[in-house]
């Protein structure tokens, strides 16, 4: 049984393992997609690549139409689904996960704050005086969960599970900060009629939630209409995904049925009445780690011979949607985003490109600013007794985590695309993001490999 590996605050073991598996595999695919984009960008296929990205895609119903090129459909359309998934993860963590209490949220919140402030200050200091370049101040503030977990997966049991959880929590808070930054700082002029339509959609979503509608289809229909309204309003269309996630129903810890089942399950574990059909960690969210070979990983009900214990996820719309979106985001949407946004021309490239203030600001913000910010703010937080290091984690291992936080990629490239229309600036951003993310991943890997010891699961 692996019930003690997280300390007292246990996250859902089975769900967490599915998350790690998908995110890490998705991270590896993301790397492959980025490499392919760079290779295509510097091959005879470059013109075909640009033709595909800029091919017009028109959707028209009567007088209404959305006319965007394929690149914009990826960044405005598919990435709205990515933001929906990220927001669902944040909501789940806030309701009953690693961000559900002050004790749990303190460390990742403080670390993420440092990882936001210091990289941004480094970028601003290097680009002070250039008003156009300053628009990219938020680019080095993000962490890519998929890439970072992909690196951790290569280390296997050398990395404590509590360290993985902390990295995920920091990255989730980073994503939340990035969402707020996009909403506040990267919004163009607004159009009132679509905004009113968006407001009406939000009212309908609220009514669905208050009516305790657990079917997902009504939320998806209204969410699609909301996306159209947000797109037409001048706000960035990906914010629609964030708003929809706010209204997807989720059962919290206060549900009376859940409390009753908690009592039964704890009694079974304490008295040893389980029949061997299941073993694992049961916490206040009533999750079970299934180990029987005849049970697949998606099973949510286990018959112990005494009572039927049903996890809350079986009836939880939030979990169902999050679980359903993960594979599409990890294996389709993010690789497509990388293919469309990671291409960098190496023709005529020289060292001058790497010492441009924008490139340096992004690269040093991620490579130096992230670990410095995470380590400094964590040290201050621990000194002031606001937080403590994760269970079974030493400072040298935590430094490895801080280095991995410098892997920006997806969100950094996304913000870079919003900050700059000029292709020259975007090339500098890509150089900075890709160089720093690669260096952060390599340094983080070897730091954790040297400092880590094999974790024995019992």
Q: Which positions does each model-derived feature cover?
A:
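Entry/N-cap segments of selected transmembrane alpha helices
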Residues: 93-121, 191-200, 347-372, 433-437
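Structural signature of hydrophobic alpha-helical transmembrane segments
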Residues: 72-83, 131-146, 187-200, 236-238, ...
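Hydrophobic transmembrane alpha-helices of secondary-active transporters
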Residues: 63, 67-96, 247, 328-349, ...
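Functional cores that coordinate and move charged inorganic groups
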Residues: 152-266
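Hydrophobic core segments of alpha-helical transmembrane domains in multi-pass membrane transport
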Residues: 29-42, 82-88, 118-120, 201-207, ...
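C-terminal ends of transmembrane helices
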Residues: 13-17, 85-100, 149-160, 203-214, ...
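Predominantly late transmembrane helices and immediately cytosolic-facing juxtamembrane segments
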Residues: 12-15, 22, 215-222, 229, ...
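Transmembrane alpha-helix boundary signature
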Residues: 40-51, 68-71, 85-101, 119-138
